[in-house]
């Protein structure tokens, strides 16, 4: 029995092959005492091992990292070499310390790789076990043996738990290096360990691991480097103790192999059990203004302000009482669940956006169902007016954080605000892992094997699922009918599901009270973003509250138009009857001339608007919301049904008058999740919270679960006084359609933005197109399309003029003047030079421009 202290899984991107479970399965199979995960420069896999390690009680789980050591992290040039170094954490504090090291290596040391210096590890030395790593280590790369002795003594002087590392490989370079390590061990009196530097669970997996490396390096089977690489990795799998002896006894002798393996167990004994910080999400402390004792008091203050802002103080007593009752109920739920602070954080960054001149969306997702959100200006959709349900957003019968999604025009500026306010170590974006799908596997592996690209593109289109087995179910004869692709299919099957790349989640932001490093380390994004090494599925599981902030380009379009026109905001407020019932806007939508209009620019959407022209000409805002809710692949049947009934077709048989009342606004079609909640509440006698639990269960589309929940609902409907026939019809209707319904709060929020952009296009087409051109100035195809559309709306677009055009498109005497930076080959930099030259010398000639180009 030995401990494997140097291992890579597929979170060593395009280098390791095995999944965490595959690696631990192999560890169990060969009887390991301990297993350490040491991926290259990251901690991506830590959470996944922690989730499953209880299934392997006989194996001690050790967390570590193969770091990139360099002399000085501030030197970033080709002469700055880096080397591999293994770092294992000894205890809980060591886990946090390693997080700090990895984070710093990304933020300050990144140069091709996240690099760290020995000085960065020094403060935490007692909490680490360090080993000298592989052929890419400093000792392996140094040819001067005396210097190697100096390096070993330096490591030992800093790290009380330092080990030299041999590896059980038969490659000539490794055999020579193992002899070197043995000699260094004797001279410096330093213990050594033996590892396998495994990049795959089993020997036969190395074939597929080699293909991953080829994908990462963009090499083919015929490349000399690819052949040499497969030789170097020949022994990089999880070997049995017998295999290690077979490989190493002839190199260093049986007794030394026994010593090296025994030392791996001694290292494992040095290490305490370490766990990832799985816990309930910890809401950070909101910095209250002076004079408020707690979050609840300040939130009520904002609500009272919003009450007046929304004009509720001018409503009749009955309408006011309805809203007061709703607010009291919502606040009782929010406060009892401890979420007052969550609303304050969202309110704060939305307020900051407004102060920074950044356009904010009307709402997104289910939050528009909250009157508290509306009164606090978190959303701009009145939930009472549109019949939106609070429990669809926050259910007192289902424990879970609120999920307030916020759309903004400039996401980066809001994140900067959060970092400036709370500190860069307390705010993070969230990592996103991209896995190799069958489609990607076919094209990538086809490239390696030398198949023509077009041939692989055509073949890959037959793979329509993200899972290989599902693809085979839909194409059972694909492999049999294409024997020429046997090798391709075999490799693609084995690579499907492996991690290929990492990116940043489009919306998620984490804010913590202490430091993100207490939870997980951070990596640096392409544009300097601070990204926690935990994805959206587990960010809340490790105790971090997630806020969703999404960048929406249309909001920048709207902001630009508003800045140009300086209109009274009431003119385009959905609560203004003149705006909501503007015939010119509905006519534009019904014409299908909706290029640039939010969410309805596609050919399919335009066709749908034209089909629904009779309904739109009735000034029915509901139609826009329904279109946005139904235009999805899994709802096309319901969409056709709605169009037929909305344009004079016969309605389906009535199940019950009470159900008709709930569905009448959508032409007796069930469209929204909120309608399902109303039906379950009315007929089943449940609360909205209980009805939402039914919605969640049905939405999982698990056959047995749907049958079980439907049966419960049938009985509830009968118990509530309805006939068994009615109960069966309702339960059948909900179970068949309930999983495909849409969130009304979301569709209404987006319908408002759709209507707003259509209104600007209908009433102020010149400024609309000017802004539309600016938002697409780097897309020549889009510009040409929109110029043609502008002609239909009688908007003239003047060609660029070197002495009059600005950087961007502008309005000049009622016409749109082409912007310099949108000209192919000019860009912003040269545009600035032209404008500066113009300002200094009056005019710029074509000759002068040509001189700048050369």
Where are these regions (language model features)?
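Domain-core and long-helix interface of multi-subunit machines
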Residues: 2-37, 41-56, 100-203, 255-257, ...
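Noncatalytic, beta-rich nucleic-acid-contacting surfaces in large DNA/RNA-processing enzymes
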Residues: 34-37, 200, 211, 220, ...
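Glycine-rich loop at the start of a catalytic domain that most often binds anionic cofactors/ligands
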Residues: 43-57, 76, 207-210, 374-384
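Hydrophobic or amphipathic alpha-helical targeting/insertion segments
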Residues: 48-62, 68-69, 73-108
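Structural signature of the thiamine diphosphate
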Residues: 59, 259-286, 435
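Solvent-exposed alpha-helices and their adjacent loops that cap or buttress functional pockets
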Residues: 78-79, 122-123, 501-503
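Phosphate/diphosphate-binding loops
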Residues: 214-217, 222-265, 396-422
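Positively charged, low-complexity/disordered segments
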Residues: 852-854
């Amino acid at each position: 029995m030995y401990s494997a202290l140097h291992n890579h899984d597929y979170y060593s991107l395009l280098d390791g092959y095995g999944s965490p479970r595959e690696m631990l399965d192999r560890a169990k199979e060969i009887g390991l005492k301990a297993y350490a995960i040491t991926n290259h420069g990251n901690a991506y896999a830590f959470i996944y091992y922690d989730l499953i390690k209880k299934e392997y009680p006989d194996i001690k789980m050790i967390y570590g990292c193969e770091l990139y050591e360099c002399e000085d992290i501030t030197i970033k040039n080709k002469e700055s070499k880096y080397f591999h170094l293994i770092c294992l954490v000894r205890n809980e504090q060591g886990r946090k310390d390693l997080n700090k090291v990895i984070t710093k290596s990304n933020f300050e040391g990144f140069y091709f790789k996240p690099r760290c210096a020995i000085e960065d590890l020094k403060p935490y030395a007692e909490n680490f076990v360090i080993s000298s790593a592989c052929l890419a280590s400093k000792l392996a790369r140094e040819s001067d043996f005396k210097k190697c002795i100096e390096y070993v003594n330096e490591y030992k002087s800093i790290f009380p738990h330092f080990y030299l590392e041999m590896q059980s490989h038969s490659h000539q370079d490794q055999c020579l290096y193992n002899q070197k390590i043995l000699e260094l061990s004797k001279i410096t009196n330093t213990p050594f360990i033996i590892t396998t530097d495994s990049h795959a669970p089993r020997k036969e997996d190395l074939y597929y691991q080699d293909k991953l490396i080829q994908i990462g390096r963009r090499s083919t089977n015929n490349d000399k480097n690819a052949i040499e690489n497969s030789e170097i990795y020949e022994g990089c799998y999880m070997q049995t103790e017998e295999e290690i002896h077979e490989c190493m006894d002839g190199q260093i002798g049986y007794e030394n192999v026994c010593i090296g393996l025994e030392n791996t167990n001694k290292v494992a004994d040095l290490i305490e059990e370490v766990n990832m910080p799985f816990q309930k999400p910890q809401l950070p402390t909101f910095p209250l203004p002076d004079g408020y004792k707690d979050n609840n008091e300040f939130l009520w203050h904002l609500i009272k302000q919003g009450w007046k802002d929304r004009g509720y103080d001018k409503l009749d007593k009955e309408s006011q009482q309805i809203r007061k009752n709703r607010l009291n109920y919502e606040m009782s739920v929010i406060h009892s669940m401890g979420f007052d602070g969550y609303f304050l954080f969202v309110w704060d960054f939305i307020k900051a956006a407004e102060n920074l001149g950044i356009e904010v969306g009307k709402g997104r997702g289910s939050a528009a169902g909250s009157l508290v959100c509306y009164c606090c200006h978190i959303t701009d959709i009145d939930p009472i007016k549109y019949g939106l349900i609070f429990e669809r957003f926050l259910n007192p019968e289902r424990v879970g954080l609120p999920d307030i999604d916020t759309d903004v025009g400039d996401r980066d500026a809001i994140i900067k605000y959060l970092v400036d306010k709370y500190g860069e170590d307390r705010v993070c974006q969230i990592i996103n892992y991209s896995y190799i799908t069958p489609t990607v596997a076919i094209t990538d592996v086809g490239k390696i094997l030398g198949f023509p690209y077009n041939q692989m593109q055509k073949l890959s289109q037959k793979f329509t699922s993200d899972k290989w087995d599902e693809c085979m179910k839909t194409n059972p004869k694909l492999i049999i009918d294409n024997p020429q692709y046997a090798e391709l299919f075999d490799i693609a099957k084995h690579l499907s599901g492996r991690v290929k790349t990492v990116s940043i989640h489009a919306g998620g932001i984490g804010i913590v009270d202490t430091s993100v490093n207490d939870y997980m380390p951070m990596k640096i994004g392409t544009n300097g973003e601070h990204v926690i090494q935990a994805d959206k599925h587990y960010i809340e599981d490790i105790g971090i509250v997630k806020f969703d902030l999404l960048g929406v380009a249309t909001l920048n379009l709207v902001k630009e138009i508003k800045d140009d026109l300086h209109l009274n905001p009431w003119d385009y407020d959905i609560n203004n009857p003149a705006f909501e019932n503007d015939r010119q806007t509905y006519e534009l939508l019904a014409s299908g001339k909706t290029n640039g209009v939010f969410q309805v620019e596609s050919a399919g959407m335009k066709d749908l608007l034209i089909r629904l022209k009779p309904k739109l000409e009735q000034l029915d805002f509901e139609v826009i919301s329904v279109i946005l809710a139904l235009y999805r692949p899994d709802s096309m049947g319901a969409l056709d049904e709605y169009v037929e009934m909305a344009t004079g077709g016969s309605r389906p048989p009535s199940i019950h008058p009470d159900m008709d009342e709930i569905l009448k606004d959508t032409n007796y079609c069930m469209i929204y999740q909120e309608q399902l909640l109303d039906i379950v509440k009315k007929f089943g006698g449940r609360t909205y919270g209980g009805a939402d639990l039914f919605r969640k269960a049905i939405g999982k589309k698990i056959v047995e679960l749907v049958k079980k929940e439907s049966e419960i609902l049938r009985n509830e409907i009968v118990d509530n006084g309805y006939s068994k026939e009615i109960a069966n019809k309702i339960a059948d209707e909900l179970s068949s359609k309930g999983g495909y319904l849409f969130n009304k709060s979301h569709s209404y929020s987006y319908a408002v933005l759709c209507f707003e952009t259509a209104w600007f296009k209908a009433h102020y087409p010149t400024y609309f197109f000017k802004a539309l051109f600016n938002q697409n100035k780097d897309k020549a195809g889009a510009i040409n399309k929109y110029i043609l559309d502008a002609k239909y709306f009688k908007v003239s677009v003047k060609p660029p003029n070197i002495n009059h055009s600005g950087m961007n498109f502008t309005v000049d005497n009622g016409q749109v003047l082409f912007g310099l930076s949108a000209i192919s080959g000019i860009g912003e930099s040269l545009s600035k030079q032209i404008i500066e030259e113009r300002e200094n010398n009056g005019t710029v000639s074509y000759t002068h421009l040509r001189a700048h180009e050369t």
